[in-house]
């Protein structure tokens, strides 16, 4: 495994560990998810370019579109929760508290 792939895999791992550790606030969870999606995008783009997969050349763009949709939905959820409850704690998203 080359050093570039190792660094991208480490970025994904650090983002995943951050998602597991800092899950009390919604904003930190969204940032970790964005880091994971960015590292997946870079890894997929490099794989497509290095192996000359012509049929899979649209896959990184599709992943980037899904990442943008995820970011938009996450930020709208963050605004809704912060306006409703006054905080961005993930504990407020539990629907069983009603």
UniProtKB/Swiss-Prot annotation:
Reactions listed under catalytic activity: a ubiquinone + NADH + 5 H(+)(in) = a ubiquinol + NAD(+) + 4 H(+)(out)
Domain of life from the UniProt record: Eukaryota
GO cellular component, as recorded: mitochondrial inner membrane; respiratory chain complex I
Assigned keywords, A-Z: Electron transport, Membrane, Mitochondrion, Mitochondrion inner membrane, NAD, Respiratory chain, Translocase, Transmembrane, Transmembrane helix, Transport, Ubiquinone
Positions of transmembrane segments: 1-21, 29-49, 61-81
EC code: 7.1.1.2
Pfam families on file: Oxidored_q2 (PF00420)
Enzyme class of the recorded protein, top EC level: translocase
Cell location: Mitochondrion inner membrane
Primary location recorded for the protein, binned into one broad class: mitochondrion
Subunit structure: Core subunit of respiratory chain NADH dehydrogenase (Complex I) which is composed of 45 different subunits.
Protein task: Core subunit of the mitochondrial membrane respiratory chain NADH dehydrogenase (Complex I) which catalyzes electron transfer from NADH through the respiratory chain, using ubiquinone as an electron acceptor. Part of the enzyme membrane arm which is embedded in the lipid bilayer and involved in proton translocation.
Similarity remark: Belongs to the complex I subunit 4L family.
Protein known as: NADH-ubiquinone oxidoreductase chain 4L
Organism of provenance: Neophoca cinerea (Australian sea lion)
